[in-house]
A protein has these predicted regions:
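Secretory/extracellular carbohydrate-interaction modules
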Residues: 1-63
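Surface-exposed cleft-lining segments at the edges of enzyme active sites
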Residues: 65-80
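Extracellular/lumenal carbohydrate-interaction signature centered on repeated Trp-anchored short motifs
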Residues: 80-87
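Short tryptophan-centered beta-strand motifs in secreted/extracellular beta-sheet-rich domains
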Residues: 87-95, 100-102
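Short strand-turn-strand beta-turns centered on an Asx-Gly dipeptide
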Residues: 103-107
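Short clusters of small/polar residues that mark proteolytic maturation junctions
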Residues: 113-114
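Ligand-recognition surfaces built from glycine- and aromatic
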Residues: 118-164
Length: 164
């Protein structure tokens, strides 16, 4: 339980400047709306695989309210629901001016907007025992860790990373 992922990040948890451009896997015990594997740019998410119910209603509300829920979910339907995350895959992130495209094994799974400030980020690969919560009234205006207890070892194996 927790999060794992790979991509690019500017290493900030502050709402207004946090800039992840990555694939992220989120799994939590208990109520957490984002249970699955997603492509993400800033607070924009596209589901690749879901572990819970459809996100169709949440997707519609998040788009109509322009992210007031903390995220904008671009589709309620996952791009590759049958994806087996226990197998090896080739993931690609194409970061271009105005948009980022995501691919799994050469299949396009999402394109998300990239707007606003100038973006600088480092390559980032991680596995963590936390998912992240958004509360727009948070005094520090940061995403908070929602720590998950894990009683078994977890692994994230990476064969290679190529940045061009």
């Amino acid at each position: 339980y927790g999060s794992a992922g790979w991509g690019f990040w500017n290493h900030s948890m502050v709402f207004d400047i946090s800039m992840p451009i990555w694939f992220i896997h989120l799994k939590s015990r208990g109520p957490y709306m984002l249970q699955g594997f997603f492509a993400q740019v800033k607070n924009h998410l596209y589901p690749v695989k879901l572990y819970g119910p459809s996100l169709s209603a949440l997707s519609l509300v998040s788009r109509l309210t322009r992210g007031r829920l903390g995220v904008v979910i671009h589709s309620g339907k996952p791009a590759l629901q049958d994806l087996d995350l226990t197998q090896w895959h080739v993931y690609r992130v194409e970061w271009r001016e105005g948009a980022v495209s995501f691919y799994v094994d050469g299949r396009h799974v999402a394109t998300l907007p990239l707007r606003g400030q100038e973006y600088r980020a480092r390559a980032d690969v991680w596995i963590d025992n936390a998912v992240f919560g958004y509360n727009r009234r948070d005094a520090g205006r940061v995403y908070r860790h929602l720590t998950q207890e894990n009683r078994v070892r977890a692994y994230l194996e990476v064969d290679y990373v190529k940045v061009t």
